[in-house]
Amino acid sequence: MAKKNKNVLVRLVSTAGTGVFWVKKRNPRTQTEKLSFRKYDKVVRKHVLFKEEKIK
């Protein structure tokens, strides 16, 4: 049998309020703080800050 994966999937939601999101894997044991990336938002056609939210 395969080992149980310890990584958690999280949504990175755009702070521009467009509803665009990226999905990333995060290991909660090694990365204790919330993720935030500056990535491209297709709706506003700019790089904006994306912050972590839980996947529902």
Curated annotation (Swiss-Prot):
Biological process GO terms, please?
A: translation
Q: What is this protein called?
A: Large ribosomal subunit protein bL33
Question: What GO cellular component entries does it have?
Answer: cytoplasm; large ribosomal subunit
UniProt cross-references to PANTHER family, sorted A to Z? 54S RIBOSOMAL PROTEIN L39, MITOCHONDRIAL (PTHR15238), LARGE RIBOSOMAL SUBUNIT PROTEIN BL33M (PTHR15238:SF1)
Q: Which organism is it from?
A: Rickettsia prowazekii (strain Madrid E)
Which Gene3D superfamilies does this UniProt record tie to the protein? Ribosomal protein L33
* InterPro entries for this protein: Ribosomal_bL33, Ribosomal_bL33_CS, Ribosomal_bL33_sf, Ribosomal_zn-bd
Q: Which domain of life is it from?
A: Bacteria
- GO MF term set: structural constituent of ribosome
**Which Pfam families does its entry note?**
Ribosomal_L33
Keywords of the record:
Ribonucleoprotein, Ribosomal protein
Give the family, as the similarity comment puts it: Belongs to the bacterial ribosomal protein bL33 family.
